[in-house]
Amino acid sequence: MPAPRGLLRATFLVLVAFGLLLHIDFSDATNMTSSTNVPTSTSSRNTVESTTSSEPTTETNMTTARESSVHDARNDEIMKVLAILFYIVTGTSIFSFIAVLIAVVYSSCCKHPGRFRFADEEAVNLLDDTDDSGGSSPFGSGSRRGSQIPAGFCSSSPYQRLETRDWDEEEEASAARERMKHDPENVIYFRKDGNLDTSFVNPNYGRGSPLTIESHLSDNEEDPIRYYVSVYDELTASEMEEPSNSTSWQIPKLMKVAMQPVSLRDPEYD
């Protein structure tokens, strides 16, 4: 994931920077020690060569040794401080890496289920309009003709507002498609054979994935038409401007096939 990778890269750069600082400090300490020792050897050589006086030579050697010991003590203190800083930075980086790793593992293991998960009973309620006795369903009450989900149901439910129609004339269907370009609705059109003709999905509907119903006919004419409920990504207005027939038009990004097929007694025609 991007967050742990960036943290590792930052930790690595910090460690490299501290390593360079330690290397530079060691080099400076070595140069200063060698430059301080040169006068000592020179003064010792001068002491051997000059025999005029022994007391000044002894004092010079003691002063040089004292300065060298003071410089070594300062170097030791600097090294201790740098070592403490190095351990602090390293420990903090390791702790941060472990914390991020734990957070990533926890979030990946505790993902909540998808927002749109439909049970089989919900699919039946969504797709089945009425029974023979004229009972009500989310699509409304009475006949299947011209049925649609009421506005109140849509406001309190993740289901799309759907409307199914069948057009007898191509001119009327073309006029409807032209209207959809300017004012798209959540509409699904079926042909009389039960196959999906054209599906329009409102791009302004919510922020979740739209619900789309597709119909499929089997080779056996006695079998009922099977409707599949699938959850797709939202369509943009530009993607909806030129819908074609069902053989070539594909909805952009299938998010989830919600459930097994649901059989209806009759197709949803207008």
Swiss-Prot record:
This is Envelope glycoprotein UL132. It is a single-pass membrane protein. One of its GO terms (cellular component) is virion membrane. Coiled coil: none annotated. Belongs to the HHV-5 UL132 family. It comes from the Viruses. Its main location: virion. The keyword Transmembrane helix applies. Keywords: Glycoprotein, Membrane, Signal, Transmembrane, Transmembrane helix, Viral envelope protein, Virion. The chain crosses the membrane at residues 84-104. Residues 1-29 form the signal peptide. It is found in: Virion membrane. Residues 33-67, 133-147 have a biased composition (Low complexity). Residues 33-70, 129-179 are annotated as: Disordered. Glycans are attached at N31, N61, N245. The keyword Transmembrane helix applies.
